Amino acid sequence: MTPRKTLRDYIRTIPDFPHEGIMFRDVTTLFADPRGFRIAVDQLLDPFVDVKIDKVAGLEARGFILGGAVAHQLSVGFVPIRKKGKLPGKTIAQDYVLEYGKATVEIHDDAFQPGERVLLVDDLLATGGTARAGIQLIERLGAEVVGCAFLIDLPDLGGRKLLEEMDMGVHALTSFDGD
């Protein structure tokens, strides 16, 4: 009998990508496997089944894949949070700090109505900078982030702590500590 795969078994680790010393967690192998992908989407939803959610927001780019699937399961709308300059029409922007500089994410200025309840989804929680910027955009439009769901948490990088200090609920399916 073949041992049952865990979610981590579906995630490929690629050493020294995109830079030497980085252990890249490649979730495309999980997305390519129908069973693994289904398990991931179901588990991302699990803590939120009894929570009223009006929309799901996904962070570029793999958060679009996960967030779209989660929104479909919930029968709610999906809102992409994109890198600067990628959305047509009127947008609002939020800068965030990277290790060596800064970046910007945007959403359409009419993406949320005041009072809407939003679940933020992405594949990876590292430093939390991108997620925090996404939360700030959602809140600037008057919506409420009811939680954040990630496939992977890299706790050594402090993202969970950052989001929890914002009183944000964080749900991650697996973590990779210093490996």
Swiss-Prot record:
It is found in: Cytoplasm. It catalyses: AMP + diphosphate = 5-phospho-alpha-D-ribose 1-diphosphate + adenine. Pfam families: Pribosyltran. GO terms for cellular component: cytoplasm. It comes from the Bacteria. Its main location: cytoplasm. Its EC number is 2.4.2.7. Gene3D superfamilies: 3.40.50.2020. HAMAP family: Aden_phosphoribosyltr. Catalyzes a salvage reaction resulting in the formation of AMP, that is energically less costly than de novo synthesis. NCBIfam families: apt (TIGR01090), PRK02304.1-3 (NF002634), PRK02304.1-5 (NF002636). Homodimer. This is Adenine phosphoribosyltransferase. It comes from Dinoroseobacter shibae (strain DSM 16493 / NCIMB 14021 / DFL 12). The lineage of its organism: Bacteria, Pseudomonadati, Pseudomonadota, Alphaproteobacteria, Rhodobacterales. The gene is apt.
